[in-house]
């Protein structure tokens, strides 16, 4: 009976995956269907949202029918995560909006102060951070350099996946219109960033981890919507201050919670900006 239930569960997961693929194909519907790279919201929590639910990691067709239950349990234990991931999403500090190229869009003096305050705040939380990953855009790199002064022993790496962009056409529609190709190009990359960085811990990870991603407002807002299984097109309804901290927790069972969203309360009021 246990094996039968597992097979049914595995079939449901497979059906869900096939459903996501089918949803991305055009059926003569609206442009939003074609441009969306995220699974449609159902109103129910998808336990296998990161495709790392232990049952989905097991090739059920290889399970021996006679020793099925015991063999299946061994496989499930092998793929079962043990650690919790703590992910801090930091929005870059204020930068010069009038720069002609990304190289020219450096932090303002206020932006450098904001990054300094964010670095102090992260250090004061007392966590043993495992890694910092930052966007390759100038404003994110400069924010990282300043924050790193307060976390000198934390390894850093960069990722183009975290660069700013337009993830999906927002709802409700806004006045600053963008052509479809912008979402068509940026959307899959930002979705790829979500899938690459936001998931439950690897089964081999023994201890809880504390990771920092330093990137951009659109990326963070989209990631929050996807991680909490909110409609992804709602991303623009969220507003984030420069240098703010958003804190996600991913449990071994795949449950996700948010402990901070755009927190900038550690900054004096006169140092807060949103550009």
From Swiss-Prot:
Keyword presence, Transmembrane helix: yes
Transmembrane segments: 7-24
GO cellular component labels: mitochondrial outer membrane; mitochondrion
Enzyme Commission designation: 3.1.3.16
SUPFAM superfamilies the UniProt entry points to: Phosphoglycerate mutase-like (SSF53254)
Chief location category: mitochondrion
InterPro entries: His_Pase_superF_clade-1 (IPR013078), His_PPase_superfam (IPR029033), Mito_Ser/Thr_phosphatase (IPR051021)
Subcellular location(s) per record: Mitochondrion outer membrane
Iron-sulfur found in the keyword field: no
Biological process according to GO: positive regulation of mitochondrial fission; programmed cell death
Keywords: Hydrolase, Membrane, Mitochondrion, Mitochondrion outer membrane, Necrosis, Transmembrane, Transmembrane helix
Reactions catalysed according to its record: O-phospho-L-seryl-[protein] + H2O = L-seryl-[protein] + phosphate; O-phospho-L-threonyl-[protein] + H2O = L-threonyl-[protein] + phosphate
GO terms, molecular function: protein serine/threonine phosphatase activity
Topology in membrane: Single-pass membrane protein
PTM summary: Phosphorylated by the RIPK1/RIPK3 complex under necrotic conditions. This phosphorylation increases PGAM5 phosphatase activity.
Similarity-based family: Belongs to the phosphoglycerate mutase family. BPG-dependent PGAM subfamily.
Entry remark concerning the domains of this protein: The N-terminal 35 amino acids, including the potential transmembrane alpha-helix, function as a non-cleaved mitochondrial targeting sequence that targets the protein to the cytosolic side of the outer mitochondrial membrane.
Biological function: Displays phosphatase activity for serine/threonine residues. Has apparently no phosphoglycerate mutase activity. May be regulator of mitochondrial dynamics. May be a central mediator for programmed necrosis.
Protein name: Serine/threonine-protein phosphatase PGAM5, mitochondrial
Organism: Xenopus laevis
Taxonomy of the source species: Eukaryota, Metazoa, Chordata, Craniata, Vertebrata
Gene that this polypeptide is encoded by: pgam5
């Amino acid at each position: 009976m246990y094996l039968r239930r597992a097979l049914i569960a595995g079939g449901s997961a497979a059906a869900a995956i096939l459903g996501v693929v089918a949803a991305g194909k055009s059926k003569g519907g609206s442009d939003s269907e074609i441009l969306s790279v995220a699974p449609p919201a159902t109103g129910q929590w998808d336990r296998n949202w990161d495709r790392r639910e232990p049952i989905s990691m097991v090739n059920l067709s290889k399970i021996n029918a006679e020793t099925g239950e015991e063999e299946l349990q061994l496989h499930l234990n092998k793929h079962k995560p043990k650690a919790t991931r703590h992910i801090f999403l930091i929005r870059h500090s204020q930068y010069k909006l009038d720069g002609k190229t990304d190289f020219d869009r450096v932090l303002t003096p206020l932006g450098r102060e904001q990054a300094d305050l964010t670095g102090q705040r992260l250090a004061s939380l007392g966590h043993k951070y495992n890694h910092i990953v930052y966007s390759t855009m100038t404003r994110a790199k400069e924010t990282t350099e300043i924050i790193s002064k307060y976390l000198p022993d934390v390894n850093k790496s960069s990722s183009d996946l975290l660069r700013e962009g337009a993830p999906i056409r927002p709802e409700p529609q806004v006045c600053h219109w963008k052509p479809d190709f912008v979402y068509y190009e940026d959307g899959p990359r930002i979705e790829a960033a979500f899938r690459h960085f936001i998931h439950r811990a690897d089964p081999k990870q023994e201890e809880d981890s504390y990771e920092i991603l330093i990137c951009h407002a659109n990326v963070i807002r989209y990631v929050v919507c996807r991680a909490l299984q909110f409609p992804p097109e709602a991303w623009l309804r969220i507003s984030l201050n420069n240098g703010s901290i958003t804190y996600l927790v991913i449990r071994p069972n795949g449950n996700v919670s948010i402990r901070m969203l755009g927190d900038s309360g550690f900054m004096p009021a006169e140092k807060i900006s949103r550009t």
